[in-house]
Amino acid sequence: MNLTELKQKPITDLLQLAEEMGIENMARSRKQDVIFSLLKKHAKSGEEISGDGVLEILQDGFGFLRSADASYLAGPDDIYVSPSQIRRFNLRTGDTIVGKIRPPKEGERYFALLKVDTINFDRPENAKNKILFENLTPLFPTVRMKMEAGNGSTEDLTGRVIDLCAPIGKGQRGLIVAPPKAGKTIMLQNIAANIARNNPEVHLIVLLIDERPEEVTEMQRTVRGEVVASTFDEPPTRHVQVAEMVIEKAKRLVEHKKDVVILLDSITRLARAYNTVIPSSGKVLTGGVDAHALEKPKRFFGAARNIEEGGSLTIIATALVETGSKMDEVIYEEFKGTGNMELPLDRRIAEKRVFPAININRSGTRREELLTADDELQRMWILRKLLHPMDEVAAIEFLIDKLKTTKTNDEFFLSMKRK
């Protein structure tokens, strides 16, 4: 029996399975408790159980494998990892581990890890000699992640506009600057769908901090990737713990030369959570932001990089502006110059119900010549010169009208040439 397969089943199937196995009074229990009871019953029959999770090492030296399905929240179905195993395999917080597990003995509360099969989807012996993430060499992104699907659909317009005005590469540190109701969540869904379709080798994680529960469900159903969330009814400590688990997991995968993409909604809310959690330093900036509160969110955002030795970590985060909160403005100002790609959304365009509501003149990617071919770059510059004299709303309306007549950006450039 596999622990992961059980976690992916809906609660109705699990309750039916519990009934078949003769476990009673489970209808009012939490999903994790039902899984725990099923595994315990299954283990008594002497069959092997396998499980996996992301390691979180606690201060006492031992650790637990947390589940991404539960957004790395501590639960009864977590798997205990002993300090001797952590030392033997040189494990760190964020390592993704698959292995055989055993049921809890008398007086124990958790399942325990018996044998490690893989670490970060690699053989355990390969994981011992990995170079630490902080010691790897960061570079500008050089490999492009195309956003367009090439099917000419209206959903594809967002991807095509991003490709034209702010191309995204592997290792990009991007900021989507968004006022309320400008369509940032839908844009993130589109970006996630495009990355999953055009770059299936990429490990995609969507991290939702302080979001509405219904948006989390929608994201889980539309995105082919890992969706980790901490909703607005959770305490700030929980937001921080989730974000730190996600970034540690991403770093460990990059050490194994994997390409990882994190889509974060939103970095403003994460910074607010850190501001609440950290001990007061006594120095307070404008808007009530503690002087040291933004160090860790900056470390999170700054982890995005293209790695010379192989692998990359891309972070596309949304920053909230025009919310009426001075704190949000201060947080945005602090993050403003740190990214190497910026995509501002415009409230005026969104109010006219024109989507994507991208302000083309202000958006762009640093060193875009490393991501695009020379002829394409020349065409993009000509397009910018053409759109620059126009008003922001007129520019995006003009571009969308022209894109709708063609299926791909190459076709669009050819039609431009003919005119």
UniProtKB/Swiss-Prot annotation:
Keywords for the protein's UniProt record, in alphabetical order: ATP-binding, Helicase, Hydrolase, Nucleotide-binding, RNA-binding, Transcription, Transcription regulation, Transcription termination
Region named RNA-binding 1: 61-66, 78-80, 108-110
One Gene Ontology biological process: DNA-templated transcription termination
Xref: Gene3D superfamilies: 1.10.720.10, Nucleic acid-binding proteins, P-loop containing nucleotide triphosphate hydrolases
Binding site for ATP: G169, K170, G171, Q172, R173, G174, K181, A182, G183, K184, T185, I186, R212
GO CC terms of this entry: cytosol
Region (RNA-binding 2): 284-288
Entry annotated with the keyword ATP-binding: yes
Keyword hit for Lipid metabolism: no
CDD domains tied to this protein: Rho_CSD, rho_factor_C
SUPFAM superfamilies on file: Nucleic acid-binding proteins, P-loop containing nucleoside triphosphate hydrolases, Rho N-terminal domain-like
Location of the Rho RNA-BD domain: 48-123
Function: Facilitates transcription termination by a mechanism that involves Rho binding to the nascent RNA, activation of Rho's RNA-dependent ATPase activity, and release of the mRNA from the DNA template.
Protein name: Transcription termination factor Rho
Native source species: Pseudomonas fluorescens biotype C
Encoding gene (name): rho
